[in-house]
Amino acid sequence: MDSKQSSELVFTVRRQEPELIAPAKPTPRETKFLSDIDDQEGLRFQIPVINFYRKDSSMGGKDPVEVIKKAIAETLVFYYPFAGRLREGNDRKLMVDCTGEGVMFVEANADVTLEEFGDELQPPFPCLEELLYDVPGSAGVLHCPLLLIQVTRLRCGGFIFALRLNHTMSDAPGLVQFMTAVGEMARGATAPSTLPVWCRELLNARNPPQVTCTHHEYEEVPDTKGTLIPLDDMVHRSFFFGPTEVSALRRFVPPHLHNCSTFEVLTAALWRCRTISIKPDPEEEVRVLCIVNARSRFNPQLPSGYYGNAFAFPVAVTTAEKLCKNPLGYALELVKKTKSDVTEEYMKSVADLMVIKGRPHFTVVRTYLVSDVTRAGFGEVDFGWGKAVYGGPAKGGVGAIPGVASFYIPFRNKKGENGIVVPICLPGFAMEKFVKELDSMLKGDAQLDNKKYAFITPAL
């Protein structure tokens, strides 16, 4: 279940000077506005992704750096907004100045083999800051490259493709669509199989805007007791949930909820264990935000090539005492209801709220955010060397407020079991408690009753 894969592996990465890759052909010079779903405070950050690839003798010694560089330039002809820069207009409205300047690219070599990373590639990755170099001056939201890509050759002939995205531009499906296009061009295509669609106006606020749904996810919650996660002493660990672990969690599911999804039961369990580990006061509100892809919730559905942000943050809210003292079914009911809240009207209401309330950040105080990327397809991206050994988020806890978010990433362990790996980021004291609580549940010896969690007292 628990992976202690660490950053003990040390190696040297030698980088070339960063360069800008511009579109291979002239592209329109224009201004394109982001949608009111893209343009929210909680997405104004850079999100890191990493893919590992084995050597493939059928590639005949081709250089992955040169192949991918050329493919990026060709792909940017179609995705030319990525080659531009963001700027703000009236009321902080974000827009892309399509300048054609290009995306940031770093070529590198590492004196390490893929095998040395171990037989279970998963976050946290050693020397991540060397595999995805933070080029000075590149990490801002405005007037900076919208993508930073580093390709690192490995001693064994494999390579690592790492990417950092300005999240206001795309969500996971949109980013994978772009990466897939780069892979197709790298393999000789003349155009992506799915052509990009901008159409960000589809997710703009109405005129006049009117908030028609309840949005607890954007409530302003004062951090009266200093319960925002401290940024020092943060520990990163990953946890694997295969058939055995999921079955163990399902033993706590009441009969009327037996049709719940793996996402739902896993989210309920992790939210509960995490809340116990950080020890909020019993009367304080705690939240779990579930990222829900809303593409299929529209009628008609959003165009298949749409690569903007098209998700919502529906939230379940309760008190720490209720969450921790009730059986798992209590949290599970809350999570199930939360996911069903997202409709076309809900998305329109969020867009309207952004305009009315000044594009607020989602609530982070005593909040846990989960994002399921098991079907996103990061690992399917093929530049000619086959599918990735690992493909997905580079670490947990990313975001404007570190430590809040976890990703559910598809994973096969060394036993050959398919499952989900979840990177968790917590302060050291909380991580120890989290591991004990989760281990207790998985061993089936957790007594989910009122006595078990009596440690939560007003004195804390």
Curated annotation (Swiss-Prot):
Active site, renumbered: 167, 382
Pathway: Aromatic compound metabolism; benzoyl-CoA degradation
Residue ranges of the TM segments: none
Identification of the protein by name: Benzyl alcohol O-benzoyltransferase
Organism: Petunia hybrida (Petunia)
EC number: 2.3.1.196, 2.3.1.-, 2.3.1.224
Task of the protein: Involved in the production of volatile organic compounds (VOCs), including floral volatile benzenoids and phenylpropanoids (FVBP), in flowers of fragrant cultivars (e.g. cv. Mitchell and cv. V26), scent attracting pollinators (e.g. the night-active hawkmoth pollinator Manduca sexta). Acyltransferase that catalyzes the transfer of benzoyl and acetyl moieties to a large variety of potential substrate alcohols, and involved in the formation of volatile esters benzyl benzoate and phenylethyl benzoate from benzoyl-CoA.
Catalyses which reaction(s): benzyl alcohol + benzoyl-CoA = benzyl benzoate + CoA; benzyl alcohol + acetyl-CoA = benzyl acetate + CoA; 3-hydroxybenzyl alcohol + acetyl-CoA = 3-hydroxy-benzyl acetate + CoA; 3-hydroxybenzyl alcohol + benzoyl-CoA = 3-hydroxy-benzyl benzoate + CoA
Superkingdom of source: Eukaryota
Gene name tied to this protein: BEBT1
